[in-house]
């Protein structure tokens, strides 16, 4: 009988040891898990950062996956030319080519009959001719006066390639494609011995109430703000400047009680578009008090300081900022490497090892 008790207690001890080991493994895994929250206003580049994580850390997009973006790319291209054509009327700009009025009529007719994401050779030719019209180009130059996708020029300048038969989208085409994020999208990947769980949350105002569910246990927030949005208004409220909205949102996040111990990284995104725009449109359109030179460095630093100055706990909390171009894989790779080092450093600090 004694031996029975002995074998039972051996079994119990074995089970206890296994459970301890599992708890230890779980604790180690949890310690290595980084919960990253991507926040920012609509169209600030959050979803493009997520696509880059797939390219950099998850073997990229297969040909089959790239093909799945073809309909989105065609839809983006068609929506872009339609937006420019409609703005021609609103802004009172005339076509230069006598044929363009007929092309506009055909564009509307084909757009109404075509299923979303389709592209016929006839439609491709109509779009190409319209895009070449100097009136359309003049209207495109005034894109901040109406709503136009950032990817418009990328696709419209490359119509021969993207409308050719047998076209397979490449990773750059995928990165430039735009689908409004609704709800919360999670991406998981490993890097530098850490397990990342990245959450991309819709940026439009209607999507923001869903953010609250993600707040618990967040290691780091990456806040995306589009530098190039300083002369643009919101899709959902044309009275509100996009940069002002972004600053307002950043203020509420960086000073929120939920995030008092959370690392915050600011991605000042779309630096490529900003660099081009700042030579034509003065920053004072958004910040009337700005009297500095309208250069990339000066105007960019001024915007950066507008964000960083909102941090009410400067002594205790550092906000790390980077100028980014979310469609540039090498730039994102370099910046994310730096972000990961910040996370590791902050984790060591929390453990008292730094």
UniProtKB/Swiss-Prot annotation:
- Give the start-end ranges of region G5 motif: 324-329
> Predominant location of this chain?
cytoplasm
Tissues expressed in = Expressed in taste buds (sensory organs of clustered epithelial cells) of the circumvallate and foliate papillae of the tongue at protein level. Expressed in enteroendocrine L cells of the gut. Detected also in spermatozoa.
An annotated Gene Ontology molecular function: GTPase activity
Q: Which UniProt keywords apply?
A: Cytoplasm, GTP-binding, Lipoprotein, Magnesium, Metal-binding, Myristate, Nucleotide-binding, Transducer
- Residues carrying the lipid (N-myristoyl glycine) are 2
Q: Where is this region: G3 motif?
A: 196-205
Q: What is this protein called?
A: Guanine nucleotide-binding protein G(t) subunit alpha-3
Species classification: Eukaryota, Metazoa, Chordata, Craniata, Vertebrata
């Amino acid at each position: 009988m004694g031996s029975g008790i002995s074998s039972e207690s051996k079994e119990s001890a074995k089970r206890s040891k296994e459970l301890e080991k599992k708890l230890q493994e779980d604790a180690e895994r949890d310690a290595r898990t980084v919960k990253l929250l991507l926040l920012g206003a609509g169209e600030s580049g959050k979803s493009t950062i997520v696509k880059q994580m797939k390219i950099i850390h998850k073997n990229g997009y297969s040909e089959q996956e790239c093909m799945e973006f073809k309909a989105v790319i065609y839809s983006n291209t068609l929506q872009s030319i339609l937006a420019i054509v409609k703005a021609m009327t609103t802004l009172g700009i005339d076509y230069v080519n006598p044929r363009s009025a007929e092309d506009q009529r055909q564009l509307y007719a084909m757009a109404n009959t075509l299923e979303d994401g389709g592209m016929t050779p006839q439609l491709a030719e109509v779009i190409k001719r319209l895009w070449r019209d100097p009136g359309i180009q003049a209207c495109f130059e005034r894109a901040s006066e109406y709503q136009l996708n950032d990817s418009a020029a990328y696709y419209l300048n490359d119509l021969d390639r993207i409308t050719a038969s047998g076209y397979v989208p490449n990773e750059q085409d995928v990165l430039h494609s735009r689908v409004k994020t609704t709800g919360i999208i999670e991406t998981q990947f490993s890097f530098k011995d850490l397990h990342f769980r990245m959450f991309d949350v819709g940026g439009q105002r209607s999507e923001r109430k869903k953010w609250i569910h993600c707040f618990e246990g967040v290691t780091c927030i990456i806040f995306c703000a589009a530098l190039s949005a300083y002369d643009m208004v919101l899709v959902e409220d044309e009275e509100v400047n996009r940069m002002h909205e972004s600053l307002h949102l950043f203020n509420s996040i960086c000073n929120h009680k939920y995030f008092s111990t959370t690392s915050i990284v600011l991605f000042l995104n779309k630096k490529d578009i900003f660099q081009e725009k700042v030579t034509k449109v003065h920053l004072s359109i958004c910040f009337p008090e700005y009297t500095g030179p309208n250069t990339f460095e000066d105007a960019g630093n001024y915007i950066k300081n507008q964000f960083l100055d909102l941090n009410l706990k400067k002594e205790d909390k550092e906000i790390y900022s980077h100028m980014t171009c979310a469609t540039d894989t090498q730039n994102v790779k370099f910046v994310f490497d730096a972000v990961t080092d910040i996370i590791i450093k902050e984790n060591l600090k929390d453990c008292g090892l730094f």
